[in-house]
């Protein structure tokens, strides 16, 4: 994968049509009211997988065109999904969506694009690419180096998040 093929600076390519990174409005106070949404849309993102809770950051769904989807899968900051099965259900939903819309481009994000995002991306590799726990974590971390945030933050952020990825691998 080309290291420069990514929608915004603090993002990275996960697979051919899947990208991950910070919240679209992460730098809202430094840029326009719409943050990085115009750049993400120009890049061709058609599905946003939002891992934040509703009270964490400003809502951005109203800035999206009607043909762009936002899927909410809230996870508390620095925490893990409610269950392995809930992530399996999410991935089955994404699998169906990608089957119906093969040209869809998915953008996975939490707030900073590190802990929760890294956890879901590692699980993505286990589910969609059939990688082992170690392979998935290694690949996620390699891809994450495309984001400047990787210079000062590890992904996933917590031991609990890493253990969730291990549990996901054991149950997949």
What do these predicted ranges mean?
Residues 1-106, 119-172:
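Cys-dependent protein tyrosine phosphatase-like superfamily
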Residues 116:
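Conserved SAM/SAH-binding loop-helix junction
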Residues 110:
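Short cysteine clusters
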């Amino acid at each position: 994968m080309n290291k420069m093929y990514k929608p915004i600076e603090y993002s990275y390519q996960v697979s051919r049509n899947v990208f991950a990174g910070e919240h679209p409005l992460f730098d809202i106070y430094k840029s326009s009211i719409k943050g990085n949404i115009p750049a993400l849309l120009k890049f061709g993102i058609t599905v946003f997988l939002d891992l934040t809770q509703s009270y964490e950051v400003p809502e951005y769904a109203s800035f999206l065109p009607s043909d762009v989807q936002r899927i909410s899968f809230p996870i508390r900051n620095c925490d893990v999904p409610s269950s392995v099965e809930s992530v399996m259900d999410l991935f089955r939903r994404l699998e169906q969506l990608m089957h119906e819309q093969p040209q869809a481009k998915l953008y996975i994000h939490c707030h900073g694009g590190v802990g929760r995002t890294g956890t879901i991306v590692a699980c993505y590799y286990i589910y969609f690419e059939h990688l082992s726990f170690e392979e998935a974590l290694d690949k996620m971390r390699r891809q994450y180096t495309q984001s400047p945030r990787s210079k000062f933050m590890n992904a996933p952020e917590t031991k609990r998040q890493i253990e969730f990825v291990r549990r996901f691998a054991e149950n997949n």
